[in-house]
Amino acid sequence: MVRRNIELCFPDLTAAEHDALVFRHFEALGMMLIEMGLGRWASDKHLESITKLTGIEHVTNALESGNGVILLSAHFTTLEIMGRVLSLNMPPFDAVFRRNRSEFMTELQRTGRERSAEFTIEKRDIKKMVRSLRKGRAVWYAPDQSYNRKGAEVIAFFGVPAMHTTATSTLARLGNATVVPFFPRRLPDSTYELILMPALQDFPSDDATADTRRYINLLEQHVRTCPEQYFWIHRKFKDLPADYPDYYADLDASK
């Protein structure tokens, strides 16, 4: 799965370079377990000593103006530790989580998010997200994984067709919210950087697909800076319409 996703997204790499990136990704997955522990149990002082936060003013300025804020992120192996760091530097916020087939994994994710966020919201509960935004709160939202329900569109990721939800545009409109993209990464010296970008201007537009493409473009740019830390273990290119390729058919057949 990991190798297939990497091959699709980085076709210009050699086979040896694919192998190296796959290996580095599994190293990042191993580090993720440690980072989850740091996010849950490390002291505030220790976390502040190993992290750098840039752009927090983009969030605080929006909140001070009375707007809700969508903290628009994505699934990186470093995300849980950075959620905790974010919580040390801004007013309490809410975090969206995805219900997993495994109840254990659902609770692991939910309780981990609760270490950072004041409240958690299941990702299908759009009404609850909108209510929170209308109250002038911030909501941490990562809508990059494959989505096959109403409101999904085929939008390329690294040039490969993928199903993406267009809900960010809807949330911003209904919640009258400012959208601030933020992405984390682990640096070569084993410290961490959390980058909060300037609020998206003219967002949402009247084209939810174009809005989503703006987000995907930003995500791709960040992935290129730390490709081993994106969550390649997820089936990013599943659930495409029938007239698109099944990128995992041979993997499924070999099970």
Label the model's feature ranges.
Residues D19-F26, N61-E64, L88-P91, K123-K255:
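Non-catalytic C-terminal accessory region of glycerolipid acyltransferases
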Residues V2-N5, M82, L108-Q109, D125, ...:
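Hydrophobic alpha-helical segments typical of transmembrane helices
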Residues M1-S73, L108-T111, A117:
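Membrane-anchoring hydrophobic helices of lipid-metabolizing enzymes
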